[in-house]
């Protein structure tokens, strides 16, 4: 019977084979026609790679079937060494969770009146509820970097 073998270049070659022929025999016939060594050949039929020890009838290859020939690639990517670091990995900063933190920002006097202890940032991008840090000489917003400095009275 006659089968077709399509190579990578798109060229189709015809082979005269028997259903009892092994895949090794087919590869040897391809070597005679194309000069490609059998150990570099991979034959594909119906999406499956054909194994050397089996016959054409095992794969249900009939007359005028087309096999696809691809070349076997040896090896793979170069192995890379695992990096070893001399210094330990730096820990990511974790914010401290303070329970009832809002109590730091307000104070209730004996009359029940609420006073703000910290200044709220007036910038539009910060919005309500963003307080400025109180330093000895300034108020500073950590979100928008707005700073208000205090005037120091000059000593004479």
Swiss-Prot record:
PROSITE patterns: UBIQUITIN_1, UBIQUITIN_2. The keyword Zinc applies. The record marks 68 as: Essential for function. Residues 75-95 are annotated as: Disordered. The keyword Chloroplast does not apply. Residues 1-76 form the Ubiquitin-like domain. CDD domains: Ubl_ubiquitin. It comes from the Eukaryota. A zinc finger (C4-type) spans 121-144. Keywords: Cytoplasm, Isopeptide bond, Metal-binding, Nucleus, Ribonucleoprotein, Ribosomal protein, Ubl conjugation, Zinc, Zinc-finger. There is a cross-link at residues 6, 11, 27, 29, 33, 48, 63 (Glycyl lysine isopeptide (Lys-Gly) (interchain with G-Cter in ubiquitin)). Pfam families: Ribosomal_S27, ubiquitin. GO terms for molecular function: structural constituent of ribosome; zinc ion binding. One of its GO terms (cellular component) is ribosome. In the N-terminal section; belongs to the ubiquitin family. PANTHER family: UBIQUITIN (PTHR10666). Ubiquitin is synthesized as a polyubiquitin precursor with exact head to tail repeats, the number of repeats differ between species. In some species there is a final amino-acid after the last repeat. Some ubiquitin genes contain a single copy of ubiquitin fused to a ribosomal protein (either eL40 or eS31). This is Ubiquitin-ribosomal protein eS31 fusion protein. It comes from Ictalurus punctatus (Channel catfish). The lineage of its organism: Eukaryota, Metazoa, Chordata, Craniata, Vertebrata. The gene is rps27a.
């Amino acid at each position: 019977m006659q089968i077709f073998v399509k190579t990578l270049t798109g060229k189709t070659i015809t082979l005269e084979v028997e259903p009892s022929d092994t895949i090794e025999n087919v590869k040897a016939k391809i070597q005679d026609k194309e000069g490609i060594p059998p150990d570099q050949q991979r034959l594909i039929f119906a999406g499956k790679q054909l194994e050397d020890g089996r016959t054409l009838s095992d794969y249900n290859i009939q007359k005028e079937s087309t096999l696809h020939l691809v070349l076997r690639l040896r090896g793979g990517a170069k192995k890379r060494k695992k990096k070893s670091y001399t210094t330990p990995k730096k820990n990511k900063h974790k914010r401290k969770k303070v329970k009832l933190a809002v109590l730091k920002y307000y104070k209730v006097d004996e009359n029940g009146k609420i006073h703000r202890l910290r200044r709220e940032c007036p910038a539009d991008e910060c919005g309500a509820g963003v307080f400025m840090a109180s330093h000895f000489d300034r108020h500073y917003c950590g979100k928008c970097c707005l700073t208000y400095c205090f005037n120091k009275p000059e000593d004479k």
